[in-house]
């Protein structure tokens, strides 16, 4: 069994002003896990994950400090240490409503999603990271 500090994983910046940091922890392309993808998102104070849709995957989203979850234009206040659910094909976004704390989102995608956007480059860097850790 391997243990990794999540903050050591490589990240990619997504979004604009302010950006959020995305770390890909588990995926078919990195760990060989075929059933799901697991992503960590760090959303800065006042940041947002801009509305987006996953056509092929359901997404379960854990909010560490709470925030706001919007799905199909319906707004939900999310309490600390809560879980939100976005079925595949639904437009959704996560919002950090604090002024001074980073919102950490743990996102579970079932089934695993196909890489898009910045993910292929992030997959390459994540594989390098895992390989170096396994050599130690």
Regions from the PLM with identified roles:
Residues 1-35, 121-136:
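A short, N-terminal "cap"/entry segment at the start of jelly-roll beta-barrel domains
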Residues 19-58:
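Active-site region of the double-stranded beta-helix
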Residues 30-34, 43-47, 66-68, 90, ...:
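Short, charged/polar surface micro-motifs in flexible loops or helix N-caps
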Residues 32, 88-118:
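Ligand-binding loop in jelly-roll beta-barrel domains
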């Amino acid at each position: 069994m391997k243990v990794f500090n999540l903050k050591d994983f490589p990240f990619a910046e997504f979004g604009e002003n302010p950006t959020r940091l995305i770390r890909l922890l588990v995926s078919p392309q990195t760990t060989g896990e075929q059933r799901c993808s697991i992503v960590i998102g760090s959303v800065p104070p006042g940041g947002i994950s801009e509305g987006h849709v996953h056509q092929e995957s359901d997404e379960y989203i854990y909010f560490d400090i709470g925030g706001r979850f919007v799905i199909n234009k319906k707004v939900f206040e999310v309490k600390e240490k809560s879980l939100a659910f976005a079925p595949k094909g639904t437009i959704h976004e996560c919002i950090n409503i604090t002024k001074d704390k980073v919102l950490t989102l743990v996102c579970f995608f079932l089934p695993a999603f196909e890489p898009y956007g910045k993910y292929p480059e992030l997959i390459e860097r994540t594989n390098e990271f895992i390989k170096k850790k396994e050599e130690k």
